[in-house]
């Protein structure tokens, strides 16, 4: 994958997901706009969760809500974005599952497209994110992380992306080793009893 420079107008990507709190994102965006920073936030996902009516009138112009989209459209949007904001918060019991037993799809998009994440420090370690490959914040101080993301020059930005590439290679190697360990078991699995593909004949949406 080609490592390209940042957009002149910084593009943040975020998902509209059940049980997430977007108050901190809205407050941070409002403060950044008041300080005349050049950016916009692309939102993908269920409009009933987080939509244009959730955003104060004076910052509606920087939020672009796409709703649910096909995977091909999602990948196009990610490719054109600069950063992925992961809105997990340690105060949420539901979100805490995403640093123990569950994996957020936004982290996987970061790995796949080499896009630096903006993520709370409480969750960063679980996903191998750190200050060398992403923008880490704590105490709900999302504003500082977004501001730093906007101000990064192209060399600093591309260094983050190159370091994400190191993570993806590490994860790939571990995955291959795990698959190799399972191969003997897979050989004896009866796939005729596997359930049908439930997504067959249905459009893939995110």
Predicted regions and their residues:
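A charged, aromatic-enriched C-terminal amphipathic alpha-helix characteristic of glycosyltransferases
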Residues: 137-147, 151-202
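Short acidic active-site motifs
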Residues: 51, 72-74, 141, 145
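Structural motif corresponding to alpha-helix initiation and N-cap regions
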Residues: 68-72, 104, 139-140
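Short acidic alpha-helix that forms the nucleotide-activated donor recognition element
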Residues: 70-83, 93, 112
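Short, aromatic/basic amphipathic alpha-helical patches
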Residues: 52-60, 128-131
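Conserved catalytic-core segment of nucleotide-activated headgroup transferases in glycan assembly
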Residues: 1-56, 65-72
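A short acidic/histidine/glycine-rich donor-binding loop in glycosyltransferase catalytic cores
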Residues: 116, 125-138
